[in-house]
Amino acid sequence: MKDKIIKKATDMFLKLGFKSVTMDDIACEMCISKKTIYKYFSNKERLIEEGTEVVHQKIHALMDEVISQNHNAIAENFQMREMFKEMFQSFDQSPAYQLKKHYPEIYQKMMENEIEDCSQMFRQNIEKGITQGLYRQETD
């Protein structure tokens, strides 16, 4: 039930905005009581935190999928950049803006995680490219 609540709430947050979706809205949409939601989440902020973690995991899984295709480093880099471009073109900026404005701590944590993962992935890509002889050794 907890995973179902996270999935539905996250879908609603991304579609309608973090601030505008209430616990009542989520309960009504799922045909459950608010008490059921509060059984798993102490407050809306906790639900948002877990929802953003699920989104982070999905993005990480997409990155892992690209890496697992064993392209050379340059092709992998281009495919990864194309994936991010598509992801952010279809990404509605309103929920991200609301998250930043109304839940800045959650937004900051989410951005730190994404930046760290992307930086690590690009560092690994550079190392792979150097090993494959596609990138120069002295690349910073």
Label for each model-derived stretch:
Residues 85, 89-123, 131-138:
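Short secondary-structure transition hinges
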Residues 4, 8, 12-46, 50:
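Helix-turn-helix
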